[in-house]
Amino acid sequence: METTRELSVVPQQGMMTKMGIINPTFIEDAVIVSEKKQEKEHPNFIESNTSGITLEELETNCIVPSFGDNQLTISHQTFIHRIEEAASIFFAGETFGNTEIRVSHKILGRHPSALTKRKEELKPEDETIYYQRMAFCFHIRTICREMNGEEVHLCIGGVRSLNEENLYGKKSPEKFKIFIGWRVRVCSNLMLTCDGLTGRLEVMGDTDIYIAALKLFREFNPEQNLRLLENLGRTMISQEQFCQIIGRLRLYQVLPASQMKELPKVILGDSNINAATKGYIDNPNFGLRGRAKISCWDLMQLLNEAAKQSY
């Protein structure tokens, strides 16, 4: 979200009158105007194919879909509220930034009174709407650290996609993802990269979301996590080592399934690996840039940038 521009006005007496420009009878004197720099609230979203929305718009303009047995799903806004409540309890006394929300895959319907109308005759009040996918996050402004020369704030949020639910059947556990970390990249189709902790939930009610969020926050050690990330910035990779990593990523894709199970899961395909290789050469932020080596931090960012191209 964009912060609003604020102007502070401070009167200073005597400035203009001492110069003999204005009669002191008519004016006290000048003002100094300063303007606060505008900054982007959240760089955390992969924004392609999504649009911003407010919590109020979710609550007033959108319906809540139900399962086949007419039991309601957990609404997007309820999901957001439960994570915010858990954060406000666990991080009591801290200052929170605005919650930014992005949605995609709009699902339209009609009120019964508009069933016989043609599409071009429909008015906004004739339609129902909900969004299949939603992601949100917010920063804790008072928990900030410097990482690799850049100030970062602790970030909390979640993402869910209703296309993972069988809305035609009876109510069943609903799927959500929540996260906490210093650097997060998230999009509405559940693609999530996070340097902290993430949790995949399958819950029957919103109370379970609240409990799971508190558990995730307790397990997260921000200082230890930050030290690990800083170590990434200090650990350098030669060109030979980078080529070995790329080669192993390609080899992973043709391993037998039994061997894959013994290794950490890799979600990068050929196109992502090619993008990371290209970024190694010409990415202005994380590539070689005339250097002989890059850091592990640069490598992580190159892979994150490559993963974004699939979404």
Model-derived features: positions:
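Feature for intrinsically disordered/low-complexity regulatory segments and propeptides
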Residues: 1-84, 90-95, 101-103, 107
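Intrinsically disordered, low-complexity regions enriched in serine/threonine
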Residues: 1-43, 119-311
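Compositionally biased, flexible interaction segments
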Residues: 56-173
